[in-house]
A protein has these predicted regions:
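Short, solvent-exposed coil/turn elements at secondary-structure transition points
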Residues: 3-4, 19, 80, 158
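Residue-level detector of conserved, well-ordered beta-strand and adjacent loop positions
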Residues: 2, 17, 164
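Alpha-helix-centered segments that form part of catalytic cores
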Residues: 1-9
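Metallo-beta-lactamase
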Residues: 10-100
Length: 166
């Protein structure tokens, strides 16, 4: 199906790329939007500090689409349902933007794992194994975006690929 298609005779499909490569949600005929992990509740953002996503630009575009979506209720997978998704989308956008700046600033001839380690140390807590894997994936997505934007360079070093802010 494509975004906007009616699925099963009643659900309108939503394109929610960003958290995952091909994530979708649905809007019911009575205006309830099931938005999955495309937007997280503020308590989840505060608790974890690193939302999982695989495509930074698409995650931001999805937040834009959610803000423009007409629905009476938005139901995220993690967080309470809300009638107005805009404050939640803005909170998610702030966290993503801040994380991008932080990762860019940590690109000082560090490996990806060095960047993840520096972020973990700065937060003052150690991630469990699952959180560590999710954190690495999000940092990898940001490094890809920063490389595409020409804001960092990558080079080979004895410890592996290292990233340097331009």
């Amino acid at each position: 199906f494509d975004p906007g298609d009616v699925v099963g005779g009643c659900l309108r499909a939503l394109d929610l790329k960003g958290h995952m490569v091909a994530m979708a949600g649905a809007v019911t005929p009575d205006g309830v939007a099931f938005v999955g992990d495309s937007v997280l509740g503020e308590e989840i953002l505060a608790k974890h500090g690193v939302p999982f996503f695989v495509d930074y630009p698409q995650a931001l575009k999805t937040l834009d689409r959610l803000e423009a979506l007409e629905a009476r209720l938005f139901v995220p997978s993690h967080g309470e349902p809300v009638g107005d998704v805009r404050p939640l989308a803005e909170a998610n956008r702030r966290v993503l933007s801040s994380l991008r700046e932080e990762v860019r600033d940590l690109c000082r001839l560090r490996t990806r794992d060095g960047i993840v380690g520096a972020r973990t140390a700065a937060r003052g807590r150690k991630d469990d194994l699952v959180a560590e894997v999710l954190h690495r994936a999000s940092v990898s997505a940001l490094l890809s975006d920063l490389l595409d934007a020409g804001e960092v360079q990558v080079q080979e070093a004895p410890e592996g690929l290292v990233y340097q802010r331009v």
